């Protein structure tokens, strides 16, 4: 059972994993439940690891606790991956990563973009992108961008208060990501964002995202 008042991650799967890990080695009693790792044995005898995380939002650059906590979580996830895997392994890191990787992932309007940067609001601050870049440069591919390198009008999060999903053009951010190790690049077939589910009654402010791998 998940406590809906706190951060949490979950994984739904068709194949039973061989091993499930909850939490990072660096977690303590105060750490929210943000990390799940499932390891699968595939029919071709290869091993696939899927890590699902809910990365902290971070509030803003000046926040005394939330912003450092976001940085620490990114560092801890990177260190875990770096210690446990190599880029040639079959590894997926996915979830609400709370960072828009490139400017084409920002769809809140130019004035709002400038204001967020000026106010130090999180989601695409330069230092945040450095945290994410460290992971991708290790050997992870943004699967959506691999298939849609130039798209600038598809987003995964839309603010309820400003009714960003209902506006035309839609106003949102692409902050939910599926990263795959370079060892999975050749098996990645397509990727997208599901607006149909976001259009349902009482939806989440986030859209489902997906990537198809043929392994």
What are the residue ranges of the model-derived segments?
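Single conserved hydrophobic/aromatic residue that forms the stacking wall/gate
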Residues: 1-8, 12
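Active-site regions of metal-assisted phosphoester/phosphodiester hydrolases
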Residues: 13-215
């Amino acid at each position: 059972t998940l406590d809906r008042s706190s951060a949490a991650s979950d994984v739904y799967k068709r194949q039973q994993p061989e091993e499930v890990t909850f939490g990072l080695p660096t977690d303590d009693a105060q750490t929210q439940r943000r990390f799940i790792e499932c390891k699968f044995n595939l029919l071709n005898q290869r091993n696939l690891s899927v890590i699902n995380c809910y990365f902290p939002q971070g509030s803003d650059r000046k926040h005394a606790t939330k912003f450092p906590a976001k940085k620490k979580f990114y560092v801890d996830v990177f260190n875990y991956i770096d210690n446990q895997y190599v880029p040639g392994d079959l590894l997926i890191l996915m979830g609400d990563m709370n960072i828009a990787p490139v400017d084409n992932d920002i769809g809140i309007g130019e004035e709002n973009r400038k204001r967020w940067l000026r106010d130090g609001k999180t989601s695409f601050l330069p230092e945040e992108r450095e945290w994410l870049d460290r992971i991708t440069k290790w050997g992870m591919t943004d699967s959506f961008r691999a298939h849609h390198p130039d798209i600038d009008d598809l987003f995964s999060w839309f603010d309820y208060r400003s009714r960003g999903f209902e506006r035309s053009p839609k106003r949102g951010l692409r902050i939910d990501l599926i990263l795959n190790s370079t060892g999975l690049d050749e098996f990645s077939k397509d990727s997208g964002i599901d607006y149909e589910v976001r259009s349902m009654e009482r939806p989440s402010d986030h859209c489902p995202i997906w990537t198809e791998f043929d392994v």
